[in-house]
Amino acid sequence: MREVMLSECMNLLYESNFVISKPFGRSCFDLIAKKADLKLLIKILKNIDSLSTEQSEELLNIARILQAVPLIIGSRTRNSVMEEGAVYERFGIKAVTFLTFQEQVRGIPPVVYANRGGFFVNIDGKALKETREKLNISVGELAEFSRVSRKTIYKYEQNEANPSAEVAIKIEEYLDVPLIKGINITDYFEGVNLPKSREEAFEKILKEGEDFKVKVIEILGDMGFNLLETTKAPFDAVAEESKNKGDEVHNVLFTNIQETENEEIRKKAIIVDEISKIFNSHSLLILETRKNEDKKIMSMSIRELEKMGDTVDLIDFIEKRKKSKDI
């Protein structure tokens, strides 16, 4: 079932002119997709409740740095089959069925979202109040017809509460005006979580006995990068260099950090390089000692890294090396 959804999703994105990555295994996301300014990090799950807290935190944090939208595509929750056309949420990440996602990609957003107590919709509170007053309908009259309290109608008008789908339809019928608003599941948002502090990241890596990785991350941090260490992604860390405060233009560096190089690590580095190209960013494999020059991989020894002064020096070095290697 999951493999079918993954295949369907890839076909849909390809047909809709997205640039897409190859699927990833054992990662907090399965697909990366980009079209113009829209960037998606997609996780495919049969049961959306199988997403772990650790996976969700990492997915949110990676999405924040990449200015991308994290999205779960699934078919059921722990207790029931997911409703078509409804938006669910897990750990602050929107979750929908494949068909709902397909409709969104084709320009038809869902209007219903699942929450405790049932299914609800977003309505235009200002339009509700203006229409009610224009038609000279009292709050009490509308409340009685909709079978909710006067206080609830006031909350709808102030956009302090949203009605159930059933109540919203009643209000629309009574006022004869469209009020329900679509939910754009691909809207960019600032991630709910923030990257862990360097101290927290170091503590976690040290527990796993990865002193070399700690040393590299510390060097990158001292250079001025905003770092996110990852355990559920194809890369070991993603580093962000903001050119100016509040500037939307920034450099992102995907890094793989390994003491020794082998065929498996090279394959992983090539995959990460493909990711970097989708985001028009950079990738770098950092090794204890760089032995062989590989045209397909941008690599650097830790000694070379230590010679870099700051983020600008490193990015310039990578860009010059890219031109000389023609990659």
From Swiss-Prot:
Gene3D superfamilies: lambda repressor-like DNA-binding domains. Signal peptide: none annotated. SUPFAM superfamilies: lambda repressor-like DNA-binding domains. Keywords: DNA-binding, Transcription, Transcription regulation. Residues 139-158 bind DNA. HAMAP family: HTH_type_cro_C1 (MF_00584). GO terms for molecular function: DNA binding; DNA-binding transcription factor activity. Residues 128-189 form the HTH cro/C1-type domain. This is Putative HTH-type transcriptional regulatory protein Mevan_1514. It comes from Methanococcus vannielii (strain ATCC 35089 / DSM 1224 / JCM 13029 / OCM 148 / SB). It holds the Pfam family HTH_3.
